[in-house]
Amino acid sequence: MAKKKALIPLLYLASIVFLPWWISLSFTKSLESWVTDWWDTGQSEILLNAIQEKSILKKFIELEELFLLDEMIKEYPETHLEKLRIGIYNETIQLIKMHNEDCIYTILHFSTNIICFVILSSYSILGNEELVILNSWVQEFLYNLSDTIKAFSILLLTDLCIGFHSPHGWELMIGSVYKDFGFAHYEQIISGLVSTFPVILDTILKYWIFRYLNRVSPSLVVIYHSMND
């Protein structure tokens, strides 16, 4: 009976780990055709207006340069100019298709992640008892560690999250989240988040050490500051 009670939280933990992957895969496959049909049938006007977005505008600037080139080479035979116009037209159609696919990708992945978040939130609420057991296991494990190991672990995590080399890791992580939600890569937004998150985490860490660790384990704080210096 005790083994069965211990197994249930472990199974719950495994389901928490693999459930997001399964939800994302299943809903992406099931919603893909529906989102594609909805966008293709009802969003053509929005698509033609949205084509002026910054990511697509660069391509059309290139096409405009080709038109200028067309004016400069009017002495070429008419067949050559006709091929040039056809090439520009085909390139324009291809850009519209690419932007159309990007919009579908964004809607599909954003919807899938929202559904995944709602399901996981409900699953966590329903599994509150298992979460309490897992939390007690974690607290017991941390309590049995020595202050030196705890200080080393805190120092390692802080260096990884807010250390000198952490911005590159944050950039990769935030870029991955952006891609997972289907958003385009905006360098300015990502740079702003990368420069903000470590500062916020550093402030939270210092407040946590001051308010919590000083009261619970003063010796741990002393060891941490000694190792950090």
UniProtKB/Swiss-Prot annotation:
Membrane topology of the entry:
Multi-pass membrane protein
Parts of the chain that traverse the membrane = 7-27, 114-134, 154-174, 189-209
Pfam families listed in its UniProt record = CemA (PF03040)
* BP terms from Gene Ontology: potassium ion transport
Localization: Plastid, Chloroplast inner membrane
The protein's UniProt keywords, in alphabetical order, are: Antiport, Chloroplast, Hydrogen ion transport, Ion transport, Membrane, Plastid, Plastid inner membrane, Potassium, Potassium transport, Transmembrane, Transmembrane helix, Transport
Residues forming coiled coils: none
The signal peptide stretch is none
One cellular-component annotation, GO: chloroplast inner membrane
- Which reaction(s) does the protein catalyse, per the Swiss-Prot or TrEMBL entry? K(+)(in) + H(+)(out) = K(+)(out) + H(+)(in)
Tell me which InterPro entries the record gives.
CemA
Task: List the molecular function annotations (GO) for this entry.
Answer: antiporter activity; proton transmembrane transporter activity
Function (record text): Contributes to K(+)/H(+) antiport activity by supporting proton efflux to control proton extrusion and homeostasis in chloroplasts in a light-dependent manner to modulate photosynthesis. Prevents excessive induction of non-photochemical quenching (NPQ) under continuous-light conditions. Indirectly promotes efficient inorganic carbon uptake into chloroplasts.
Say which family it is in: Belongs to the CemA family.
Q: What is this protein called?
A: Potassium/proton antiporter CemA
Organism name:
Fagus sylvatica
